[in-house]
Amino acid sequence: MSVANSSHRAALLRVLLILLVAQNLARCQLTPAPVQICHSFHCFGEMCYQEAEFANQIAECEPEEHHCELIQLTTVHYMARCSPRCEGEIGTSYSPCLLANNSAPSPGPCSLQCCSGGPLCLVLSLGHLTIQEDKLVLTPPALVRNQAVQGVLCEGDSRQSRLLGLVRYRPERGVQEHALFLYNHRRMAITGDDVSLDQIVPVSRDFTLEEVFPDGELYILGSDVTVQLDTAELNLIFQLPFGSHTRTFLQEVARACPGFNPETPDPEFLWLSRYKCTEQKPSQRGWNSASGTWPECTRKGEDQPSIGGGGSWGGALLEAVQAGRSERCDEELEGADWEMSAAAGSRERDPAGGSQSDDLRPDGKGLLVDQSFRGQDKPDSLLTRQNKSKSEITDMVRSSTITVSDKAHILSMQKFGLRDTMVKSHLVQKEEDYTYIQNFRFFVGTYNVNGQSPKECLQPWLSHGIQAPDIYCVGFQELDLSKEAFFFHDTPKEEEWFKAVSESLHPDAKYAKVKLIRLVGIMLLLYVKQEHAAHISEVEAETVGTGIMGRMGNKGGVAIRFQFHNTSICVVNSHLAAHTEEYERRNQDYKDICSRMQFCQVDPSLPPLTISKHDVILWLGDLNYRIEELDVEKVKKLIEEKAFHTLYAYDQLKTQVAAKAIFEGFTEGELTFQPTYKYDAGSDEWDTSEKCRAPAWCDRILWKGKNITQLSYQSHMALKTSDHKPVSSVFDIGVKVINEELYRKTLEEIVRSLDKMENANIPSVSLSKREFFFQNVKYMQLQVESFTIHNGQVPCQFEFINKPDEESYCKQWLNANPSRGFLLPDSTIKIELELFVNKTTATKLNSGEDKIEDILVLHLDRGKDYFLSVSGNYLPSCFGSPIHTLCYLKEPILDLPLKAIRELTLMPLQTEDDGSQLKNHMDIPKELWMMVDYLYQNAIQQEDLFQQPGLRSEFEHIRDCLDTGTTDTLSASNHSVAEALLLFLESLPEPVICYSAYHNCLECSGNYTASKQVISTLPTFHKNVFDYLMKFLRELLKNSAKNHLDGNILASIFGSLLLRNPAGHQKLEIAEKKKAQEFIRQFLYNSP
Amino acid sequence: MAKKTYDLLFKLLLIGDSGVGKTCVLFRFSDDAFNTTFISTIGIDFKIKTVELQGKKIKLQIWDTAGQERFHTITTSYYRGAMGIMLVYDITNGKSFENISKWLRNIDEHANEDVERMLLGNKCDMDDKRVVPKGKGEQIAREHGIRFFETSAKANINIEKAFLTLAEDILRKTPVKEPNSENVDISSGGGVTGWKSKCC
């Protein structure tokens, strides 16, 4: 499990040149400078990076030199300078490894290139990887890189490092396929050809990559994520480094899976065929085979993205694996010079060639990843001092009680609703309600080890004379001064010191390692007492380099942030710039660390956390502030006199803090120990070297936050390995501990209050009335009932909605006005329910098939539904009643019981008067006779009869007279009666000329004999009515001199009333209308 | 702590004769309160409440329906989409108990086939006015293979338990899903469309 840090340890890349250029690029993007400034130096080996004063002169370039150039002349000889061109000096004997330009006025950043003629290249950046998709517009066609991560392939007991790269192929818009490329890589992989393709796993439908939890192993925070790759053919287990990087990668892969949507075509993976040759020749796997290339592949075609598949892709992956998420350069990857760099690469290799791995190298620095974890097998004297072995530590970590649950879900969890955010912010607000302060003991230690390996037991520093602390924060500087540590970010010292610390932790308690983070020589270790492990969460670690060119890792800081119970804690270990006079650089380094140190949050939608956003900050390290203005002898004398107070005044850190230049809000304990720098190694003697440095309190510990009590602050003279002495401080820190019961209660309250809020936000209105009774509804008489909707506090949209299986929200005779609308909070609207019975609805109401009864559903969008009940009684009328029914009604319709009307209305229409039914009937409806007779008596000479509209009020009177049989009281204008007659004919459910005879009539139109024949087939009552009406109309025509009526007018008026198209009220064609008129006309001019 | 606020949304429905206390049952569960004045529900009301079951946050959207007979044809249209239905009768009202079988038929006709049903005999605090013995409730529940509780919204007896049990039964039937599963609509919030979506 402690492979966890293999990402730091594994020899992944990092050529100085690449970095330099990248950093330069990144920096210049941040602050474009008018004048190009480049490093300019020749240097050899370690001198190049150890101390700025030995190399790395900064030069201002000539106006036409817009680029910085970095050249590796031999494996140890480097050169940097300004350059007028971006392309490098191709063709010269040495390899211009990388170049970059960055600023105006040159045309865009010229990519760096130490990579290949292929489309891809090592791109660089410090830190972790993220790839920007937008630069994927590169060749080859639509082949893009998405994500990559370095992991460990577990096969049985074997552990091999692999680079996993997710590659997307998008041949055309909307179509994409993915494959996972697995690469072997050489231990100190630098360029693309140190990487070789191991295999390609197409992301097919049966592809899964899932996090798994090995049986019996408990999940440890900060430990590797074990994932299982499954396809139909494969089953592989990988361990990926913990953190947001891996999380992103897994999410990307999950997103790449084709899913099971049958609509999308099965991926075909034809594009992978070009890599097939590498798969077919497993024996040639490995960087060292045939100088890292597969000729048969490279010659396949111009568009091949790689040398041997592994080369440039692998290079890109290398870059991907290490690329920083914070600073990135958008390099164009053209004009690359792969061949040359490949040559350079091969020169770098062991000339013996065949060596399989670097652990055989004579310098012995390159332990294989897996081997480096078995350090205790080596006959190392370190092991003899310990009281805990490495394996024991590991076991303890395993047995800690953190459960898998949360973090695992977070990996796949992206949705965070608004409600969630509110719950969280409420929880933060109410923190005091459910937490209490409990003191925990923190040990904070810092030690500049000057590149040495551990030679002494660290117990005097870490555990003597104290109680077992709850948390250990142990920082080192100058862990490894070697070239490899700097170039390749890889050092065996990490493991050595980790082990030395682990073995010297307090013997009274068991500790679990939470996290190890290292930037070159700056390392920070965080341990927690095993029983507290469950309360550590959200662990993130980051590094910031402030060294060479402001970015390199020879100086800078590393930090681990975590949540302990409910308190957020950030521990920073920094190694700031050296030299007495450079305090301003140190100040700047401090500020850079503060501003550039950013931790990803669990919720990716939240902005990254900075150091200052923590409840507790512990800052330790070789801050390198010196004692100034006093000569060496004076300092030593004051020290001898223990006159530390006098010395404080000259301590740069004290004066800079006092000047508020740095560490604002931080506290440092009183310095009661003598300066910790600089001693002759192995002794307590002050530096006797030529330089004879003045003693200084380089190594310091500061803190910021509430409830922090420093219990001790001291140096440890007993340790003599380094030219520094280690410093330690023990704190009691009040941590906010959650009272589970109160927490649950608080959470419950919050959830309740949110529920309450949500319920209160459901639109709700009050209605002034819900039951509506319409009394004595009459034919063609509008009745209106109104009510008001009073809205509550939520704006809402209301609408009457249809009931199931109904075509409108209410019955035909009803209408709501308005039927929909929008209401502001607390506003009111008046709704009118209009009831109007017309010819279409009257018959069923007469017959009782329909009633004045309805339920309206008033629906509020996102809210409740209200039911409104409508009821009432309808007064039957001759209007809307069938002719034959009326013929049987000897009494006025309103004098009859409803039941009788109902029966008569529903009585079927008889075509033959077989006389079997009621004998007691009239020949025509008396109501018709009443109206016609009235007109005959009063309006026979009336001008404009049937053409001038009547009065609505008079119609109601006429209707009432007819329905109550009180025609003797009828007093209305002739026009009103005429219109009532027309309405009567219009509202007949079966027209005078029955629907069934309609087409016959039209056909015989013009043939009077045939027409009469059709009329004779009508049911008796209908025939009677027709004859009666025709007789009346002929009477009218006799008076045409007075009333100005003519046959055409009457035929056109009565044609459409007596002859009605059975298809309903469709617009009649003119020809059809004409025929109907003609049909009637015949009867107006011919006597029967 | 950064958990989702809720993982699942369950739509529950309260049905039963008018006056058996459906609204009070809901009011007790959602607001932990009781109101003695009877206001007949004329329409469809709903409230939400978030509960936690088996580590999952579940949002219950509980629909309260009008019990009056004249609204039955309309209210049955709200059955569709309900994952759980609580059928409530009043232990002091024999008629409301007799109607149980009619309500059950309604459920069969109009609700989803796999809807989880539950029978509640409400007003169990009024033992002196009881006309439906507990055994009869248990028997009819057994016959139909559904759960039964006697509850009192007024005395807060078994209300929470009934809802949680119903939610648990639904949860048990709900296939284990990843949080992003689309089978469960977690995005609609309080969105209610009635049957409107069907027609227009």
Swiss-Prot record, chain B:
It is a lipid-anchor. GO terms for molecular function: cadherin binding involved in cell-cell adhesion; G protein activity; GDP binding; GTP binding; myosin V binding. A lipid is attached at C199, C200 (S-geranylgeranyl cysteine). Mg(2+) binds at T23, T41, D64. A motif (Switch 2) lies at residues 64-81. There is a cross-link at K102, K136, K154 (Glycyl lysine isopeptide (Lys-Gly) (interchain with G-Cter in ubiquitin)). The modification N6-acetyllysine is found at K102. Ubiquitinated upon Legionella pneumophila infection. Ubiquitination does not lead to proteasomal degradation. GTP binds at residues 18-24, 35-36, 40-41, 67, 122-123, 125-126, 152-154. One of its GO terms (biological process) is regulated exocytosis. Its main location: membrane. It catalyses: GTP + H2O = GDP + phosphate + H(+). Regulated by guanine nucleotide exchange factors (GEFs) DENND4C and RABIF which promote the exchange of bound GDP for free GTP. Regulated by GTPase activating proteins (GAPs) including TBC1D21 which increase the GTP hydrolysis activity. Inhibited by GDP dissociation inhibitors GDI1 and GDI2 which prevent Rab-GDP dissociation. The keyword Nucleotide-binding applies. CDD domains: Rab8_Rab10_Rab13_like. Belongs to the small GTPase superfamily. Rab family. NCBIfam families: small_GTP (TIGR00231). Switch 1, switch 2 and the interswitch regions are characteristic of Rab GTPases and mediate the interactions with Rab downstream effectors. The switch regions undergo conformational changes upon nucleotide binding which drives interaction with specific sets of effector proteins, with most effectors only binding to GTP-bound Rab. This is Ras-related protein Rab-10.
